[in-house]
């Protein structure tokens, strides 16, 4: 048998975006090839050993709801789990986990090697095969040519990557890996708009040289221990470890200031812009000069290593300065640095040159995902990779592209922000970026997306069965609470007083009682007349039971707010999803200013909603566009054709609550 050289989809890069892209397209039945420069680094956590966080955890849950691997791999490799913002409302609660780098990478590789329709091949890609205005394949560094209907490029920080430590620099995709110089040059020939960004990583420390007696311990959540995947179990977690906390001080800051004359950031050597929300320690000292201390988290890298990741001191200062600043902190006076911190500059491409499917507008069948689009973070990369993989598979199968709306998923917010607003610095997801965050919670990601994922072909039978059991149980139990009543005669005074603080004076449904502050689902079910709850085999599944209770309680307690938000979504959606024709010349739209028509012709928004979010767009311009479309009978609602998920949002409103 000849070695296969023709595929439906080729994925270039084996990081968080590439692995999710390859798995997604293969799950859909597309014959997929994953090309990576080193099979041993598939799924590698290049920077921090953690997954999740505010906004990021929401993306991981959405990837999981669509059948992705990140959440499940984190459950298998996670060595500490916490719920952030646990005392706040459900919209901003977020899961975060420390992961054993080796276990996480093994979990990802195991899934890749056992995924039907997926081939792996270790070779860097030096060239893309482009015929006319579409991509038709990729060429490896030794000249092997693979053809495909679609190519997903997930190059991370490797495109013309340059690593900086002090005033020394060298080419590299990350420490120990070569940069993709030839591929970068080839992409520049395609005249896609591009720029340079920068990110960084801290020095790593040998835990045997840390004095933990001087540090504050930060354990994970233990009762209950969180899980990331909707199918996960706490029993899957390996041994759990604490993190530790120290702080910078005035001496630390003086050491950093003394080295700024040899900092590549402050001497103009680095041209790329770094991430605003994950700044280097030298940037923190400069931007927050009045602050005399910064918190530093010492995070274990795994169960079989002594290496610690000091979260909060990402730096590109010279090594002698790195050593001095580490030794200036409490508990690290004798610390041995195993690896120096560094900054890395790399090419990215303006995401406004992409469709919402993450396909480039200029070259058919070429998809970009991850840091190549100007984002930062494993979670943002994985979410984009999943979407690009789905749409590359659909492109190869000659089906319409799919992308969730802003009111459907954080993934929709992420993509819409990228393709309409672009980036001037590495983009990080936050809950504050979503207009409808009460509807886009971690706990209901499956209710929002799993049915769509099933239609797309990325959700398997096991997940689909678990989802249906949960959805049906939530619906049945919510209805029971709304139709079960207690009266002053049936509810003893002592029970009412214990739960509500006073006896009831008239008839209430259990749902009405649950809506009161401080009243829990278990408390209501403990009342005389309120007994029951999810039954049959569900009660034996503790995790599923906990998920069901959480959905019911949030849905009932926040019902008014959720319904109000749903009404707002419906009102705003009237024009939000109206498509703009591909070939429209905006200079011919009467009344539009030259500036507005120029921007519309440059960025080619797909919908009225996207057009409204372009910088400089005015309400008057949007009104003129709507008049133009109506006069010519153009425009249709996005999602009203054969694209999956067109009707799922409305059908699942009650289940989401």
UniProtKB/Swiss-Prot annotation:
NAD(+) binds at residues 274-288. GO terms for cellular component: cytosol. Gene3D superfamilies: FAD/NAD(P)-binding domain, GidA associated domain, C-terminal subdomain, tRNA uridine 5-carboxymethylaminomethyl modification enzyme MnmG/GidA. GO terms for molecular function: flavin adenine dinucleotide binding. FAD binds at residues 13-18. PROSITE patterns: GIDA_1, GIDA_2. It is found in: Cytoplasm. GO terms for biological process: tRNA methylation; tRNA wobble uridine modification. It comes from the Bacteria. Keywords: Cytoplasm, FAD, Flavoprotein, NAD, tRNA processing. Belongs to the MnmG family. Homodimer. Heterotetramer of two MnmE and two MnmG subunits. This is tRNA uridine 5-carboxymethylaminomethyl modification enzyme MnmG. It comes from Burkholderia pseudomallei (strain 668).
């Amino acid at each position: 048998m000849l070695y296969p050289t023709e595929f439906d989809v080729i994925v270039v890069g084996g990081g968080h975006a590439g692995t999710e892209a390859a798995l997604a397209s293969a799950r859909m039945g597309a014959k997929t090839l994953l090309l990576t420069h080193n099979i041993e680094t598939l799924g590698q956590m290049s920077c921090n050993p953690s997954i999740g966080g505010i906004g990021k955890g929401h993306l991981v849950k959405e990837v999981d709801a669509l059948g992705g691997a990140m959440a499940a791999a984190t459950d298998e490799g996670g060595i500490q789990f916490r719920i952030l913002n646990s005392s706040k409302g459900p919209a901003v609660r977020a899961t975060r986990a420390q992961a054993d780098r080796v276990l996480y990478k093994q979990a990802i590789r195991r899934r890749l090697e056992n995924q039907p329709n997926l081939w792996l091949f270790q070779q860097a890609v030096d060239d893309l095969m482009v015929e006319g205005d579409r991509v038709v394949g990729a060429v490896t560094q030794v000249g092997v040519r693979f053809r495909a209907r679609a190519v997903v490029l997930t190059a991370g920080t490797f495109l013309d990557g340059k690593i900086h430590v002090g005033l020394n620099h060298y080419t590299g995709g990350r420490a120990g890996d070569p940069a993709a110089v030839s591929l970068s040059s080839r992409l520049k020939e395609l005249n896609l708009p591009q720029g340079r960004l920068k990110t960084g990583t801290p020095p790593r420390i040998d835990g045997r040289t840390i004095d933990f007696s001087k540090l504050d311990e930060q354990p994970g959540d233990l009762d209950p221990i969180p899980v990331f995947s909707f199918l996960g179990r706490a029993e899957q977690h390996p041994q759990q470890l604490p993190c530790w906390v120290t702080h910078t001080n005035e001496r630390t800051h003086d050491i950093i200031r003394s080295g700024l004359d040899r900092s590549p950031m402050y001497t103009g050597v680095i041209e790329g812009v770094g991430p605003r929300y994950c700044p280097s320690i030298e940037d923190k000292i400069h931007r927050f000069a009045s602050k005399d201390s910064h918190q530093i988290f010492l995070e274990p890298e795994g169960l079989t290593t002594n290496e610690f990741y000091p979260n909060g001191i990402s730096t590109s200062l010279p090594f002698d300065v790195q050593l001095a600043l580490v030794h200036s902190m409490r508990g690290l006076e004798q610390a041995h640095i195993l690896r120096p911190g560094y900054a890395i500059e790399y090419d990215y491409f303006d995401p406004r040159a992409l469709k919402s499917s993450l396909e480039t507008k200029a070259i058919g069948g070429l998809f970009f995902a991850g840091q190549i689009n100007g984002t930062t973070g494993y979670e943002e990369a994985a979410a984009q990779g999943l979407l690009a993989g789905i749409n590359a598979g659909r492109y190869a199968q000659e089906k319409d592209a799919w992308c969730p709306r802003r009111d459907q998923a954080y993934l929709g917010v992420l993509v819409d922000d990228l393709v309409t607003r672009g980036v001037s610095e590495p983009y990080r997801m936050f809950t504050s970026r979503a207009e409808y965050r009460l509807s886009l919670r971690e706990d209901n990601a499956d209710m929002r997306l799993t049915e769509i994922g099933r239609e797309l072909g990325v959700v398997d039978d096991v997940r689909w069965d678990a989802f249906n059991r949960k959805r049906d149980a939530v619906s049945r139990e919510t209805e029971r609470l709304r139709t079960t009543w207690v009266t002053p005669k049936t509810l003893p005074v002592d029970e009412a007083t214990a739960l509500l603080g006073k006896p009831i004076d008239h008839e209430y449904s259990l749902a009405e009682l649950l809506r009161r502050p401080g009243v829990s689902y278990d408390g209501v079910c403990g009342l005389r007349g309120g007994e029951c709850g999810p039954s049959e085999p569900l009660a034996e599944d503790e995790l599923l039971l906990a998920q069901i209770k959480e959905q019911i309680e949030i849905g009932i307690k926040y019902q008014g707010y959720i319904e109000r938000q749903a009404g707002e979504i419906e009102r705003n959606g009237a024009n939000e999803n109206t498509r703009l024709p591909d070939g429209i010349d905006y200079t011919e739209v009467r009344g539009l200013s030259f500036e507005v028509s120029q921007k519309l012709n440059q960025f080619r928004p797909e919908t009225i909603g996207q057009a409204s979010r372009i910088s400089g767009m005015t309400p008057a311009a949007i009104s003129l566009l709507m008049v133009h479309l109506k006069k010519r009978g153009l425009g249709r609602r996005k999602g009203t054709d054969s694209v999956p998920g067109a009707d799922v949002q409305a059908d699942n409103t009650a289940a989401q609550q």
